[in-house]
């Protein structure tokens, strides 16, 4: 075990929070629940930088100084990273995340432009997955209006919920006393319907200029995973969730008129099934 694993004292809990930026549970923001959380800022997400994401951590000892070097473990991929005296665990993790994301370079582009500071080292043969400054700037601007975007999504979801009550459908619960969703997707399941019947709804909606989606097709149904020997018959719950799911449009560019148009047509088409 590394010193970090020993400090945590158990299996580290990592949260895939790709869709959850802005969500909370029992009063805690999603990034404050697990030890590590990863967020996606892809172009289709609520909060976007066009491409990219973020890794956050929430460690009770994060502000404590690292007493021993994390990298003394020979099996640790970071065994070549030098120790910095007086560094906290948060600072240590941030530094290592930077190294992982930019080919293991120990200086960023700005640091190399300082007078006489051209030289740098490659500490490890790692990855190229850093967010550019340009797209980060998009995120900083969007952050200023994100609260309003979440509120708009909540109102749209409330309207969908009310309008679809008469239908034989189940929708994802976005809000209750214990949790607040980011309102990323509006998922609807057409009870008692097959995938083929649900696809007909998608086609008819498309004929009326309304783009819907499916979230998600199970991996065992994908060609690459079939080649690996996966069979959807072994995953009945995944197929059950997929077989009659349809995702309705939900974005802050939609006007109230757009929303009503989607509702009117969806209710009509589903009622005729």
Task: Give the ranges of each region predicted by the language model.
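Glycine-rich phosphate-binding loop of ATP-grasp-fold ATP-dependent ligases
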Residues: 49-54
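Conserved beta-strand->loop/alpha-helix structural units within folded catalytic cores of enzymes
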Residues: 47-48, 259
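Hydrophobic framework residues that shape the active-site pocket
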Residues: 41
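Acidic active-site catalytic centers that drive phospho-/nucleotidyl reactions
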Residues: 15-16, 35, 133, 249
């Amino acid at each position: 075990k590394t010193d970090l694993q020993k400090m945590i004292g158990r299996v580290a809990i990592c949260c895939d929070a790709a869709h959850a930026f802005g969500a909370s549970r029992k009063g805690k923001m999603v990034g404050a629940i697990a030890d590590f959380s990863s967020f996606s800022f892809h172009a289709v997400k609520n909060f976007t930088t066009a491409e990219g994401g973020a890794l956050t951590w929430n460690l009770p000892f994060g502000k404590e100084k690292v007493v021993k070097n994390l990298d003394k473990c020979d099996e640790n991929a970071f065994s070549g990273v030098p120790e910095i005296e007086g560094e906290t665990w948060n600072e240590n993790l941030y530094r290592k995340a930077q190294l992982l994301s930019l080919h293991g370079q120990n200086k960023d582009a700005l640091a190399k432009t300082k007078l006489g500071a051209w030289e740098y080292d490659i500490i490890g043969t790692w990855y190229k997955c850093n967010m550019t400054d340009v797209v980060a700037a998009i995120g900083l601007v969007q952050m200023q209006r994100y609260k309003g975007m979440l509120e708009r999504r909540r109102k749209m979801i409330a309207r969908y919920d009310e309008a679809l009550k008469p239908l034989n459908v189940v929708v994802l619960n976005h809000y209750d006393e214990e949790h607040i969703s980011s309102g990323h997707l509006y998922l609807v399941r057409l009870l008692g319907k097959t995938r083929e019947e649900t696809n007909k709804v998608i086609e008819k909606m498309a004929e009326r200029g309304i783009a819907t989606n499916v979230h998600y097709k199970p991996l065992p149904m994908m060609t690459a995973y079939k080649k690996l020997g996966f069979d959807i018959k072994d995953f009945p719950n995944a197929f059950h969730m997929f077989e009659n799911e349809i995702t309705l449009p939900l974005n802050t560019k939609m006007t109230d008129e757009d929303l009503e148009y989607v509702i009117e047509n969806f209710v009509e088409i589903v009622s005729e099934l």
